[in-house]
Structures are given as structure tokens and as C-alpha cells.
Design a protein with these regions (language model features):
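Ser/Thr-rich, low-complexity intrinsically disordered terminal regions
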Residues: 20-129
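Bacterial N-terminal signal peptides that target proteins for export
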Residues: 1-8
Length: 129
């Protein structure tokens, strides 16, 4: 293999390894479901969101009727989401971030994992309600 071919292969590997962004994941209208099948109140849904967030290090703040804002700070990285909810559904949508390379609808790939974990946590708390 020539040096230029080796260099090209190395450059490609570095470029691919540097791909640390992914499209921003938003959760839209996830169903509110309890294990018993009984409808939950707004207070129960809010409490489930707060418990799920707290268990994962999110700071949850009520910003208005049926609207929570979640903030996750890990070292120098900050993610902020808004979580509108009702007795039937909730959403988790990107609001802002610091040091997460957000630009043009893409963000650091770890962000989506945090949102998936938060969504799973909320669903687990709703089921337990």
C-alpha cells in the first residue's frame, strides 16, 4: 500500500470517528399508560415526569400549566427540553443546549441517548402509577 493510500485510509477513519452528531430526537405525543389501565390525573403524570427525571439527574421545573422544563447538566454539557403533558400524552422536545454541537437540527449523539433514557423512565413511572 502506498503512503498516500495509507494516509487516505487514515484520514477517512479520523473523519468517520469525528462524526459525533445525529439528528435531534424529539418525542411527540407519547401515550400516557398506567399498568392498571385506569386514567391518570395531571398531577400523577407530572409526578411521574419529575420522578423519572430526578432518577436520571434531570432538574425538572414547572413552567406553566401542563408544561415541565427539564435540564440535564453533565460536566460542561447542558441539555434543556420542554415536556408538555396531559392525561393522555406527553412530548419531549429540544429547547436549548450548551456544548452539544447543536446546529441545523443535529446535535451531539449522546443527547439522543439521554432523551431515550428519560422517555423510558417516564414510561416506567407512568406504568407504576
Amino acid at each position: 500500500m502506498h503512503i498516500s493510500a495509507k494516509f487516505g485510509a487514515l484520514l477517512l477513519a479520523v473523519v468517520l470517528a469525528g462524526c459525533t452528531t445525529a439528528p435531534i430526537m424529539n418525542v411527540s405525543e407519547a401515550s400516557v399508560v398506567s399498568a392498571s389501565g385506569k386514567p391518570l390525573t395531571n398531577d400523577q403524570v407530572r409526578a411521574a415526569i419529575v420522578r423519572a427525571g430526578a432518577a436520571l439527574g434531570w432538574q425538572m421545573k414547572e413552567e406553566g400549566p401542563n408544561l415541565m422544563v427539564g435540564t440535564l447538566q453533565l460536566r460542561t454539557h447542558v441539555a434543556v427540553v420542554q415536556i408538555p403533558y396531559s392525561t393522555k400524552a406527553y412530548s419531549v422536545t429540544y429547547r436549548s443546549s450548551v456544548n452539544l454541537e447543536e446546529k441545523g437540527g443535529v446535535i451531539h449523539k449522546n443527547y439522543n441517548g439521554w432523551i431515550q433514557n428519560l422517555t423510558r423512565g417516564i414510561n416506567a413511572q407512568l406504568s407504576a402509577s
